[in-house]
């Protein structure tokens, strides 16, 4: 009887707890397992890992809930989008370079948003570590190879999830509607489908962003044709594919360097995109967990 009563009591407590949540969100944990996180109140002490998270919260009007922006690796060289500059300037004093777990604990957050690698032993600690301390965690699904097929819809889900969590659903829906409107406008204004490669220069070869990457999905949503599915392409393979357009991925201040390098490779002179000067630089953070930059 005691066991039955205990089970019944625990079951009631679980139901009450679920009923107390104003929203429940699907995400993943440090073990890549799908989990549900519930919110009974709007987070007030948020650690936003990387600029794209801070920009998304600014766009939603929730930047005052941020207690720390964590710049990781190359983030320190990036600028916020111009429309968010005023709010971003107010975040400078609470911006950190590569927070440690100990520093994060001392900030007493109630919510942490980041990549999969944010929540490991080299980052801020595992999701389990934080969840046991009553801190919710959210991992962007297109970070660190979490999904086999990255899509624009994944980033729209991130924006909508943030809207639900911070009770800014109208604002998040407007952002997503604007993304879809921009896609339709671009499709209607462009000509024939282009043969496209999205490449990152790796020295003697290129990393290729194929249809399973967010960059590839973006091209295809705009009715472009991603013409290779290999993740690594040699010069010879690029010549054989002969794309009409190349989007060249760069990281921070190396935009002109990357352009100069690809145009100075003699072996590629016969490629249509090179001959016709149709190589367009695109910074990594616009195609990798871009948030509102998409």
Regions found by a protein language model. Give the residues of each.
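Bacterial Sec-exported substrate-binding components of ABC uptake systems
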Residues: 1-56, 164-199
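Extracytoplasmic substrate-binding proteins
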Residues: 10, 122-202, 229, 278-294
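Solvent-exposed, polar/charged alpha-helical surfaces in well-ordered, non-transmembrane soluble domains
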Residues: 44, 54-58, 102-106, 128, ...
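A short, structured surface patch at a secondary-structure boundary
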Residues: 47-107, 111-119, 227
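Structural recognition of the beta-strand scaffold that forms the well-ordered cores
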Residues: 47-49, 67-70, 111-115, 137-141, ...
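Solvent-exposed loop/turn segments at secondary-structure junctions
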Residues: 52-55, 72-75, 111-112, 117-121, ...
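Alpha-helical, coiled-coil/dimerization segments enriched in small aliphatic residues
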Residues: 74, 208-234
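A ligand-binding cleft/hinge motif common to bilobed small-molecule-binding domains
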Residues: 118-132, 250-263
